[in-house]
């Protein structure tokens, strides 16, 4: 388990399996295996807009049996040529809002 982001080589390529072992304060995303630090807490205006959009999206998608999630919520993006195993996933993002309409894509760790 890694507890300090400074212990990581930012030039290395990491997988979701690596990501799961990290326990530090900084929030980050993996894009094609590269670490990207997320900005600190969003502004008040950002939060207002996000919540307004969440309300609109929730009302729109509710009859369609879709799920709306807000950050932090891990979304693992897969390469269709590879497996969905943690070591084969190299992109993990935390969008402000995320709509998932396929229940099979949701698990206890987020969505894939």
Residue ranges and their predicted role:
Residues 1-112:
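Gly/Pro/Ser/Thr-rich low-complexity, intrinsically disordered segments predominantly at protein N-termini
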């Amino acid at each position: 388990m890694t507890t300090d982001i400074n212990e990581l080589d930012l030039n290395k390529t990491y997988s979701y399996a690596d990501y799961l072992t990290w326990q530090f304060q900084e929030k980050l995303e993996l894009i094609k295996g590269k670490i990207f630090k997320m900005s600190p807490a969003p502004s008040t205006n950002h939060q207002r807009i996000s919540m307004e959009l969440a309300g609109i999206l929730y009302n729109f998608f509710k009859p369609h049996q879709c799920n709306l999630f807000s950050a932090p919520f891990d979304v693992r993006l897969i390469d269709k040529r590879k497996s969905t195993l943690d070591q084969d996933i190299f992109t993990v993002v935390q969008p402000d809002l995320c709509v998932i309409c396929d229940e099979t894509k949701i698990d206890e760790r987020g969505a894939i």
